[in-house]
């Protein structure tokens, strides 16, 4: 019972932080709508609709798969295998997110013309594609820290990510975009991308500081595919239904 209490309290902490971030994010969106107007908000929503689908496809179930594989190794007291787990998950994530990002970057003009119906979103979609692999790799590290029960650390990084996104977005809006809808949309995507870079850097640095033992290479690929591919398929189908 004593061991379960920290897990319970950390789960409460993560839930509370997520609720707080949602409240802050909603308030920030309301403030943005006043700054950039209805046209800017409409453009942002169009980009985020396509971006969310691309993100789901790029993540390809890797966050949950990383969490599952990490928890399995820790449960069997094999911390020496964590380096191989993370390296394989990183390779999978880079392959999937890189493929999706390339398709989004090259296909942005076609999507803007034939699907979205607004060519102003092309620069924002391409900028989103540039940052997409970073966002997906952050999902790998988030899954690892969740499985390792380092919820407090993850919550602190998520708060810092939200604050960084807001600061970068507001600074670029006031210094460059003004009331221009296309530039405002770019600022929002830039804020999210920069904050994802900060998050990935922080989580990788914290992981390196752990200095866990390294063991012999183990077969991870099949286990990863069995965990990630079904999740990826279900997530993509659900996201396609909600987007269309």
Where are these regions (language model features)?
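N-terminal membrane topogenesis motif
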Residues: 1-24, 80-87, 218-234
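Transmembrane-helix boundary and interhelical linker motifs in polytopic inner-membrane proteins
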Residues: 5, 37-40, 54-91, 146-153
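Interfacial/gating helices of multi-pass transporter permease domains
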Residues: 32-53, 120, 185-186, 223-227
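Small-residue-rich midsections of specific transmembrane alpha-helices
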Residues: 45-74, 89, 93, 100, ...
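Alpha-helical transmembrane segments of multi-pass membrane transport and lipid-handling proteins
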Residues: 87-114
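Alpha-helical transmembrane segments of multi-pass membrane proteins
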Residues: 102, 106, 117-141, 167
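Membrane-interface junctions at transmembrane-helix termini in multi-pass inner-membrane proteins
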Residues: 134-157
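Hydrophobic alpha-helical transmembrane segments
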Residues: 156-171, 179-209
């Amino acid at each position: 019972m004593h061991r379960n209490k920290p897990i319970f309290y950390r789960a409460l902490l993560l839930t509370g932080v997520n609720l707080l971030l949602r409240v802050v994010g909603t308030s920030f969106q309301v403030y943005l709508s006043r700054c950039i107007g209805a046209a800017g908000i409409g453009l942002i929503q169009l980009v985020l609709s396509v971006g969310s689908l691309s993100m789901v496809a790029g993540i390809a179930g890797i966050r949950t798969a990383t969490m599952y594989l990490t928890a399995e190794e820790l449960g069997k007291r094999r911390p020496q295998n964590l380096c191989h787990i993370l390296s394989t998950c990183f390779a999978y994530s880079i392959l999937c997110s890189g493929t999706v990002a390339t398709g989004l970057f090259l296909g942005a003009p076609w999507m803007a013309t034939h699907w979205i119906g607004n060519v102003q979103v092309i620069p924002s979609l391409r900028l989103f594609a540039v940052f997409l692999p970073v966002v997906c790799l952050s999902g790998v590290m988030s899954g690892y820290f969740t499985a390792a029960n380092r919820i407090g650390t993850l919550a602190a990084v998520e708060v810092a990510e939200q604050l960084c996104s807001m600061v970068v977005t507001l600074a670029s809006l006031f210094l460059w975009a003004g009331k221009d809808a296309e530039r405002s949309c770019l600022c929002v995507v830039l804020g999210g991308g920069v904050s994802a870079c900060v998050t990935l850097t922080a989580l990788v640095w914290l992981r390196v500081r752990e200095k866990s033992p390294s063991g012999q290479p183990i077969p991870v690929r099949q286990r990863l595919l069995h965990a990630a591919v079904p999740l990826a398929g279900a997530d993509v189908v659900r996201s396609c239904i909600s987007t269309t």
